[in-house]
Amino acid sequence: MKKVQVKVIREEGVELPKYETEGSAGMDVRANIKESITLKSLERILVPTGLKVAIPEGYEIQVRPRSGLAIKHGITMLNTPGTVDSDYRGELKVIVVNLSNEAYTIEPNERIGQFVLNKIEQIEFVEVEELDSTERGESGFGHTGK
């Protein structure tokens, strides 16, 4: 398992992110808030996690929504997946949005998202006159049907 250094600046009682099952790809991350926050319909907010991390070079952390919050309450994230770069050292925060028609209250220590550690590789673009051809060609959105 890859080790990632973390500086914790969380409120008392807020748990560190953890994998909820043995096969989980993402670690559930919690709201580092002292008091409940109520999001009105279509409102968005930046929720602190209380964590600063030192991601190893060549990796990123992706910030993703939790499927249960999305299907049950219409709560998801903007800028999904969000990328945390290896050279960022500030507090990790999550952009939460309420897409439902009803207000939703985020409680202190509530699981609000997931962190997934991914290996990345930087690329360099090389300008060419023509690209090699493929069977698909330039067929884009909806090219395979419904």
From Swiss-Prot:
* GO BP term, example: dUMP biosynthetic process
Q: Which Pfam families match?
A: dUTPase
Reaction catalysed by this enzyme: dUTP + H2O = dUMP + diphosphate + H(+)
Q: Which residues does substrate bind?
A: 66-68, 79, 83-85, 93
Q: Which cofactor does it need?
A: Mg(2+)
Please provide the record's keywords in A-Z order: Hydrolase, Magnesium, Metal-binding, Nucleotide metabolism
EC top class named in words? hydrolase
Recorded metabolic or biological pathway in which this protein acts:
Pyrimidine metabolism; dUMP biosynthesis; dUMP from dCTP (dUTP route): step 2/2
EC number per UniProt: 3.6.1.23
GO molecular function (one) = magnesium ion binding
- Entry superkingdom: Bacteria
Sorted alphabetically, which InterPro entries does this protein's record hold?
Answer: dUTPase, dUTPase-like, dUTPase-like_sf, dUTPase_trimeric
Name the job this protein performs: This enzyme is involved in nucleotide metabolism: it produces dUMP, the immediate precursor of thymidine nucleotides and it decreases the intracellular concentration of dUTP so that uracil cannot be incorporated into DNA.
Q: Name the family the entry cites.
A: Belongs to the dUTPase family.
**What protein name is recorded for this chain?**
Deoxyuridine 5'-triphosphate nucleotidohydrolase
Question: What's the gene?
Answer: dut
